[in-house]
Amino acid sequence: GGAWSDRLIRVAATGSNDSGVSWIVETDGRRIFHAGDLNNWYARFLTDDYRGGLVYSAEFGIDVNPEKEEKRFLGELKDIRKITDSFSVVMFPVDGRIGYTRGARQFIDTFQVGLLVPMHFVASGFESAWRMKEFTDAKNIPFWCISSEGDSIEY
């Protein structure tokens, strides 16, 4: 991806396994990661009874191979790790449509994270994002979730 900077901020586009890009923003000595649509999108199909091969995704109207898609996602994390292994703040999708926490858990297993902020969960309800808190607590990672649109935090 490309990058842009001035004397106050540096913004770099990094990969995604979906349309668009993810972002690394550096400012005031902090490194912020915005995942965009980067996630383990088909994690919900990786259940105990999954036998491999293609699975039909009714949401997207296509056949997908969840194992192959997970490898693509993990490959993107590997590429980002070539740039850095830590972030002050991470904004990452945690959504019931995609298996809730698997992608975010894989992210915090790969990187040092100062604060995790879930996103993309409004369609599945604000409470769905709280499923991630037990995993951030286990790693002593601060967790902040909005309770309504317009909420903000100073960190």
Range-by-range predicted roles:
Residues 1-85, 148-155:
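Core dinuclear metal-dependent hydrolase active-site scaffold
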Residues 36, 93-96:
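Structural motif
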Residues 88-91, 114:
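Conserved acidic residues
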Residues 27, 90, 142-144:
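Generic alpha-helical hydrophobic packing signal
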Residues 13-16, 20-22, 90, 104, ...:
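Small-side-chain structural scaffolding
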Residues 1-5, 101-155:
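Binuclear metal-ion centers of metallo-dependent hydrolases, dominated by the metallo-beta-lactamase
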Residues 15-19, 95-99, 122-123:
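Short beta->alpha connector loops
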Residues 75-80, 97-106:
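A short, acidic, amphipathic alpha-helical segment used as a generic capping/interface helix at domain edges
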